[in-house]
A protein has these predicted regions:
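N-terminal glycine-rich phosphate/pyrophosphate-binding loop and immediately adjacent elements
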Residues: 11-132, 138, 243, 293-300, ...
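Glycine-rich loop(s) and the adjacent beta-strand/alpha-helix scaffold that form part
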Residues: 60, 66-71, 136, 226-235, ...
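Redox-cofactor-proximal catalytic regions of oxidoreductases
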Residues: 80-170, 212, 404-421, 425
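Conserved redox-cofactor binding core of oxidoreductases
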Residues: 116, 129, 134-238, 244, ...
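Mid-to-C-terminal "cap/lid" subdomains and adjacent gly/pro-rich loops that border
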Residues: 214, 273-277, 281-406, 417, ...
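FAD-binding beta-loop-beta segment adjacent to the flavin cofactor pocket
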Residues: 405-413, 509-527
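Short FAD-binding loop at a beta-strand-to-alpha-helix junction that anchors the flavin cofactor
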Residues: 524-536
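A conserved FAD-binding loop/helix module that cradles the flavin
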Residues: 539-553
Length: 610
């Protein structure tokens, strides 16, 4: 009896570790050689719903370089936000990288991608964008409602977030749009992918809609390169991939012969251009310098990298405040978005014996606001050590932050090594374009007004003027690392000194330059890129969750009993299912439409799976 119970518990633990999905396996279980209709590289925010949809009719392989998000409290629980980002271990779901600008950043290394790490903000695309895309508004709204039953929730608006809302209205960011998932100028309360119990719902949860017999997901399976063939082909054609399992053994996955079989890269703004280069698609000289055989000289791979700058001001509070991520946003007409996050110890679980400081941790780099070039590991270690001796009361308060739309400044990405697990070298050139700096200054001025407003007076010390708050933020995480004494007098200096990321980096495989309007890689066949690397800039469909990666579609499903979603009201005629993952580090929006394709509302990119 005891043996049977132990076996049952072991089985249940294993199954729930996979989210209850029988098709998720460790890479060590993969056959040495296998064949599929579609091979999706990256089981992130874009890859998961794409795979779930395609699996209704085709055989799909998903290769995820990271592990499972299920049963990981640092991912699941809102109260632990920041812990995963602070985890710098090799098995962490977050992989830290530092741009050549010196800004600390992170990329997902887990099934579900950025939705397993982000602050969870959820939004719909605006109705003007839907109209411009040419979608059937009724079907789109019907689909939004369906999705929102699964991943979108109304956050509880407590005292600190209520004060932020009232302050935004007091300083004139109007009208008040209440709780809405739409993108509207003014002040609003948005949705969240955290439910009422503070549990995260990621894009990996959308695998529940997959056809179990049509999909295979391997974890800890980084792809080394895409394989190409030219035999009997007018130009290079993707034929499969080589991936490595957790024990270091190589496996070969090939496309089945057929007109529709494809390799689809969904590895994100860093991973996708990196993988193209490692596979021989990129600037010829750069590839040759790394002894990579050139399949196609494509000088624009890795170009046009952008990251939306974020700047924040920490406001210590004389009274306890709730733990909250982004809930209230002020959408302005000048190109900046005002938001806030709060909480004692900022997400650090109070039951933990050790203190990793959650969102406050210098390991994250978000609020380690030394100028980028001074954010050395030695400085961060010194800050962490100093913070350990501070009382918990020192961490009570919140951040008012601003993020600029766009941005206009651009950089580039290059390989460091031939190892796909290593971070490439990326430069974003923050504030290189004067327009970005001007937007930042305007945003900081609005933050000052919010902090000085009557509505926010209960949550700030009256004896601390704005100049002191700016200097506190500019000088240190929790006042420990000194810097420019004049930061409060020069907002331009403050913007430059305290620039951070909000994880909305994008570019590297732009539409019209690296991929065509159908997201097919130009110059080769049977290969697409579908993620934020295709974006020229982040569309402002949401005040804080600007689109970083998009776009997921499925094929027209002929003669298939349904369109891939349980209990959905399908049409009798031929159904087209279009899944649009309008996602950044902080959004998940899925749209079902009657048009074959998806479109980025701002850029006007449409993709058709033909």
């Amino acid at each position: 009896m005891a043996t049977g119970l132990s076996a049952l518990l072991l089985c249940l633990g294993f199954c729930f570790g996979r989210g209850g999905f029988p098709f998720i396996h460790q890479s060590t279980a993969a056959p040495m050689v296998s064949y599929y209709d579609y091979i999706i590289v990256g089981g992130g925010t874009a890859g998961c719903p794409l795979a779930a949809t395609l699996s209704q009719t085709y055989s799909v392989l998903v290769l995820e370089r990271g592990g499972s998000p299920f049963r990981n409290p640092n991912i699941t629980h809102l109260s632990r936000f920041g812990a995963a980002l602070s985890d710098l271990s090799p098995k962490s779901p977050s992989q830290r990288f530092v741009s050549e600008d010196g800004v600390i950043n992170a990329r997902a290394r887990v099934l579900g991608g950025g939705t397993s790490l982000n602050a969870g903000f959820y939004t719909r695309a605006g109705s003007p964008y839907i109209a411009k895309a040419g979608w059937d508004a009724k079907l789109v709204n019907e689909s939004y409602r369906w999705v929102e039953k699964v991943v979108a929730f109304q956050p509880p608006l407590r005292q600190w977030q209520s004060a932020v809302r009232n302050s935004l209205l007091e300083i004139g960011i109007r009208p008040y749009n209440g709780y809405t998932l739409d993108h509207l100028y003014g002040t609003k309360v948005g949705g969240t992918i955290f439910d009422g119990y503070g549990r995260r719902h990621t894009s990996a949860h959308l695998l529940r809609y997959a056809n179990p017999s049509g999909i295979t997901v391997f974890l800890h399976a980084p792809v080394q390169k895409i394989l190409f063939t030219t035999e009997g082909k007018p130009r290079p054609t993707a034929d499969g991939v080589i991936f490595t399992d957790a024990s270091g053994l190589n496996h070969w996955a090939y496309l089945r012969r057929g007109p529709n079989s494809e390799v689809i890269v969904c590895s994100g703004a860093l991973g996708s251009p990196q993988l193209l280069m490692l596979s021989g698609l990129g600037p010829k000289r750069h590839l040759q310098a790394h002894n990579i055989s050139v399949v196609l000289d494509q000088p624009l791979v890795g170009q046009g990298m952008s990251d939306n700058p974020m700047n924040a001001v920490f406001v210590p509070s004389p009274r306890p405040v709730e733990v909250s991520l982004i809930q209230v946003v002020g959408i302005t007409h000048n190109g900046s978005y005002i938001e806030g996050a709060s909480g004692e110890n900022f997400g650090t679980d109070q039951t933990q014996s050790t203190r990793d400081f959650g969102m406050f941790s210098p390991k994250i780099g978000q609020f380690s606001t030394l100028p980028p070039k001074q954010r050395t590991q030695k400085a961060l270690d010194r800050a962490i050590q100093a913070m350990r001796f501070l009382p918990r009361s020192a961490f009570v308060g919140g951040f008012i932050l601003e993020k600029i739309m766009g941005p206009l400044s651009r950089g580039h990405l290059q390989l460091r090594t031939k190892n796909p697990n290593d971070n490439p070298a990326v430069t974003f050139n923050y504030f290189k374009d004067r327009g970005d700096l001007e937007r930042c200054v305007q945003g900081i001025k609005m933050i000052e007004k919010v902090i000085e407003s009557r509505s926010f007076s209960r949550f700030r010390y009256n004896y601390l003027p704005i100049s002191s708050l700016l200097n506190m933020t500019a000088n240190a995480p929790v006042n420990m690392l000194p810097k420019h004494a004049n930061a409060s007098r020069s907002l331009e200096q403050f913007c430059r000194d305290t620039v951070m990321t909000i994880w909305h980096y994008h570019g590297g495989c732009h539409v019209g330059k690296v991929v065509d309007r159908d997201y097919k890689v130009i110059g080769v066949d049977a290969l697409r890129v579908i993620d934020g690397s295709t974006f020229d800039y982040s569309p402002g469909t949401n005040p804080q969750a600007t689109v970083k990666l998009s776009s997921i579609t499925s094929r027209r499903i002929k003669g298939h009993p349904g369109n891939g979603f349980p209990n959905d009201q399908r049409k009798k005629d031929d159904t087209v299912l279009a899944l649009l993952a309008v996602v950044t580090e902080e959004i998940l929006v899925i749209v079902k439409g009657s048009i074959v394709g998806v479109e980025c509302p701002i850029i006007g990119l449409k993709m058709k799976m033909t």
